[in-house]
Curated annotation (Swiss-Prot):
This protein's name: Aminomethyltransferase
InterPro entries, alphabetized: GCS_T, GCS_T_bac, GCST_C, GCV_T_N, GcvT/YgfZ/DmdA, GcvT/YgfZ_C, TrmE/GcvT_dom1
Any single GO BP term: glycine decarboxylation via glycine cleavage system
Subunit (UniProt): The glycine cleavage system is composed of four proteins: P, T, L and H.
PANTHER family for the chain: AMINOMETHYLTRANSFERASE (PTHR43757), AMINOMETHYLTRANSFERASE, MITOCHONDRIAL (PTHR43757:SF2)
Function: The glycine cleavage system catalyzes the degradation of glycine.
The entry's keywords: Aminotransferase, Transferase
Molecular function in Gene Ontology: aminomethyltransferase activity; transaminase activity
C-alpha cells in the first residue's frame, strides 16, 4: 500500500468536505461537492486551489544567472527587476519537454532565483537541475516547508484583501507575471492556470490551514483538480503529460513563444535539437477543437483533416461553453476551420479554433 503524500492544507480539505484522490502520489481534492459550481465560481467570482504538490526550489550562487541561461529555453536575462517571472520549457538534449515551469528573479544581484515546477515531475526536474547545475556551482534549496494556494477569479484579489488588507499596495501594483516577497516566507505572484485574474500565494506550511479557512470565510470557494482541469482547458493552457512530454518539442505544443533564440551566443539544453527541427520543418501545430453536439472529446482521439491525421491531446466538456472542447495537434499545413474527430469509431464534425476558448470569463471566438 503506497502512502500518499499530503499538503499543509490537508486538514482544511477534510474539514471542507473534499473528495480526495491520488494525483501523482499526492492526496488532493478532486472536488468539494460540485466541480461545475467550483468552475463557475472562478469564472464569475473567486475560487482557490491547493497547488502545494508543485515544487518550489530556491537557487543561489554567483553563477545563478548563467545557470538558468543554460538550463531553460526562455532567457532569464529578460527578468529586468526583482520579482519578475518567466514561463519556460525545461528541455532534454533531444529538445523534448521535461517540464514547464516558472522562474522568479529574487534579488538585485541576479544571484538568487526561485523555480516553481510541476508536482508530477519533481524527481526528473530535480535531477536535471543538479545535472546542469554542476558546472555552475549553484545551490538548490527545495522548499518542502512551504504551501502554495492559487486564488483565482474576477473577485479573487478583492476577497484576498479582506483577509490580508496590509497587502493592498503590493498586490495592486503587481502586473501579470510579477511576484513580491512579503517577508516571513510569504510570497505572492500575479500568476495562475485558469485564464482569470488572480494570484498564487506561497506561504509557510504551518500557516496554511488558517489562511485557507480565512479565505473560505471571506467567500472564496474551495476548488478541486476537476475544476482546475476544465478551467485550464478553456484557457488553452497545456497540461504536462498530456499536451507536451519528453518526446514533444515546444514548437509542436504551442510553446514556441517560450523559446528565446535572440542571443545566438547563448547555448541552452535542447537548443541544437530545436534548431535542427526548425530547419527540417515542424510537422504539426496546436489548435483548439469545438464539438458541435453529442459526445465528449477526450485525449488520444484521431483527428481527420484534408492534410492528414492529427490527435487530441486533452479533451473535456466545457462548463462555460456547454460544449465539448479539445486541444489537438494537427498537420502544420492544415489551415481549415472544420475537421472531423473519431468518437467511438464514428466521425463527428468539429470547429477548429485558435486557442484560448475562454479568457477573463469571455468566449474568444464567434
Amino acid at each position: 500500500m503506497i502512502t500518499l503524500k499530503t499538503t499543509p492544507f490537508h486538514q482544511a480539505h477534510q474539514d471542507a468536505g473534499a473528495k480526495l484522490v491520488d494525483f501523482a502520489g499526492w492526496e488532493l481534492p478532486i472536488h468539494y461537492g460540485s466541480q461545475i459550481a467550483e468552475h463557475e465560481a472562478v469564472r464569475t467570482d473567486a475560487g482557490m486551489f491547493d497547488v502545494s504538490h508543485m515544487l518550489v526550489t530556491d537557487v543561489a550562487g554567483a553563477n545563478a544567472k548563467a545557470f538558468f541561461r543554460k538550463l531553460i529555453a526562455n532567457d532569464v536575462a529578460k527578468l529586468a527587476f526583482v520579482g519578475k517571472a518567466l514561463y519556460s520549457a525545461l528541455l532534454n538534449d533531444n529538445g523534448g519537454v521535461i517540464d514547464d515551469l516558472i522562474v522568479y528573479r529574487t534579488n538585485e544581484a541576479e544571484t538568487q532565483y526561485r523555480i516553481v515546477s510541476n508536482g508530477a515531475t519533481r524527481e526528473k526536474d530535480t535531477a536535471q537541475f543538479h545535472k546542469v547545475g554542476q558546472e555552475f556551482g549553484v545551490s538548490f534549496n527545495p522548499r518542502y516547508d512551504l504551501g502554495m494556494l492559487a486564488v483565482q477569479g474576477p473577485k479573487a484579489i478583492e476577497k484576498l484583501l479582506t483577509v490580508k488588507p496590509e497587502w493592498a499596495d503590493v498586490v495592486h501594483n503587481l502586473k501579470p507575471f510579477q511576484g513580491a516577497d512579503l517577508g516571513n516566507d510569504w510570497f505572492v505572484a500575479r500568476t495562475g492556470y485558469t485564464g482569470e485574474d488572480g494570484v498564487e500565494v506561497i506561504l509557510p506550511g504551518t500557516e496554511a490551514v488558517a489562511f485557507f479557512k480565512a479565505l473560505q470565510a471571506a467567500g472564496v470557494q474551495p476548488c478541486g483538480l476537476g475544476a482546475r482541469d476544465t478551467l485550464r482547458m478553456e484557457a488553452g493552457m497545456n497540461l504536462y503529460g498530456n499536451d507536451m512530454d519528453d518526446d514533444t518539442s515546444p514548437l509542436e505544443a504551442g510553446m514556441g513563444w517560450t523559446v528565446d533564440l535572440k542571443d545566438e551566443s547563448r547555448d541552452f539544453v535542447g537548443k541544437a535539437a530545436l534548431l535542427a527541427l526548425k530547419e527540417k520543418g515542424v510537422a504539426v501545430k496546436q489548435v483548439g477543437l469545438l464539438l458541435g453536439k453529442g459526445g465528449i472529446l477526450r485525449a488520444h482521439m484521431e483527428v481527420l483533416t484534408d492534410k492528414g491525421k492529427g490527435e487530441t491531446t486533452s479533451g473535456v466538456f466545457s462548463p462555460s461553453l456547454k460544449q465539448s472542447i479539445a486541444i489537438a495537434r494537427v498537420p502544420k499545413d492544415f489551415d481549415g476551420d472544420t475537421a472531423k474527430v473519431l468518437i467511438r469509431g464514428k466521425e463527428a464534425d468539429v470547429r477548429v479554433l485558435k486557442l484560448p476558448f475562454v479568457r477573463n470569463g469571455q468566449k474568444q471566438f464567434d
